[in-house]
């Protein structure tokens, strides 16, 4: 059995499709993976759905009747994973955390469509860039 998407890193994460969301994660050493859906940002647990394993360690699940604003995480079990911990999607485009010492990182499904109105990438040479990094 193979997933519908192309096998590229860009196909991992959460994608809106046909009145639902397709979730895809790469976890080759996991024995089981559960998608956890949260009702509220402060929730510590949620509804769990067993994901299907495909070739080469890809895990997938189609959540029907869900969309933008869905909060989720993953629970993995296996030799390298603690099944008591819910983890955020490493491929997510947005996340939610609580400002506390013990929070459960949650990923958030967002609308990432934007009309760039024909704008193009600047392609500035790396030698002309000035990049600052700050930790707060």
Whereabouts are the PLM-identified features?
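The feature marks proteins involved in alpha-glucan
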Residues: 1-18, 22, 53-133
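Short beta-strand elements bearing conserved aromatic residues within extracellular beta-rich modules
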Residues: 33-35, 72
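Solvent-exposed serine/threonine-rich low-complexity stretches and specific carbohydrate-binding patches
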Residues: 45-54
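Residue-level signal for secondary-structure boundary sites
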Residues: 31-33, 43, 82
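Short proline/glycine-enriched turn/loop motifs at strand-loop junctions of beta-rich domains
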Residues: 26-33, 67
């Amino acid at each position: 059995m193979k997933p519908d998407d192309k096998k590229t890193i860009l196909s991992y994460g959460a994608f809106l499709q046909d009145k639902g969301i397709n979730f895809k994660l790469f976890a080759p050493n996991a024995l089981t993976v559960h998608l956890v859906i949260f009702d509220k940002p402060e929730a510590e647990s949620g509804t769990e759905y067993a994901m299907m394993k495909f070739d080469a360690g890809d895990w997938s699940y189609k959540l029907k009747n869900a969309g933008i604003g869905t909060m989720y995480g993953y629970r993995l079990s296996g030799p390298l994973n603690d099944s008591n911990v819910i983890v955020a999607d490493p491929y997510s485009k947005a996340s939610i955390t609580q400002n506390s010492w013990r929070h459960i990182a949650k990923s958030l499904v967002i609308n990432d469509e934007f009309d760039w109105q024909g704008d193009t990438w600047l392609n500035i040479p790396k030698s002309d860039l000035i990049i600052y990094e700050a930790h707060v």
